[in-house]
Amino acid sequence: MSSFFKKISVLAANCLWLAVCMPGWALFLIATRRVKSVQTARLRRILRQNSKTEFGRRHRFDSLRTPEDYLSVPLTDYEDYATAIGAIQTGHANVLTAEPVELLQPTSGSTTASKRIPYTRSLQSEFKEAIVPWIASLYLARPSLLLGRHYWSISPNTEPVSRPEDTHSRVRVGFADDSEYLGTIQRLLTRLLFPVPSEISQVRNPRSFEYLTLLFLCRERDLRLISVW
C-alpha cells in the first residue's frame, strides 16, 4: 500500500468512525440535560430485570424504587462476589443477573490479584454506548486525530490467561480481542486504524507481548492516539 493511499484510507476510516459515533454523541448530550431522571430510570430497569435473581431476592430489589432506596444495599468488594462468580463459572444461572453471562473478563491485576468480571450482552452494550460519545468528543476536540492511527490497550495479556478453575469453565473467559468492546462497524475499522495486529493478544509471555507491541508502535509514523485503560 503506497504512503498516499494509506493516508487517504486512514482518513476515510477515521471520518467514518466519527460519523458512526455522532448519533450516540448527540443522544448523550441530550441525556446530560436530565441526568437524575435518566439515571433513576436506568436504575429502576436494572432492579426490575434482576429482582428474581439470587442477589436481587437477597437485597429485596422488588421493593426498591429510587436511588435513596438503593442505599439499603450494603457496600461490597470483589471478595463478596467470589462465591457467586464461581457458581456462574460452573454453569449456574440467575445468580447475579437474570440475563445470561456471556463471558468472564479478567482484570489486568496491576494493583491486586486478577478478578473475573461477569459480562452480559447488556453490559457490553452499555460499554459501547459509553465509548461512542467519548470517541466523537475526541475527534471533535482534536481533529488531527483524523489523520492518524490509534493504539488502545484495555486488557493487556501480560499474565497467563487461565487459572485451574478456568479449565472446566462453562463460561468463556476473556474477550478474544479488545475490539470486542466496540460495535460491529467500529471493529471492522480497527483493522485499518490499529497499528498493532490483534494476533499479538495471543502472546502470553509478558516480555514478548510488550516487545512486539512496542515494535509495531515504533514502526507507525502516524500514531495519533494512545489510550491505555
What kind of region is each of these model predictions?
Residues 2-33, 37-38, 43-229:
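Active-site phosphate/ATP/adenylate-binding loop shared across adenylate-forming ligases
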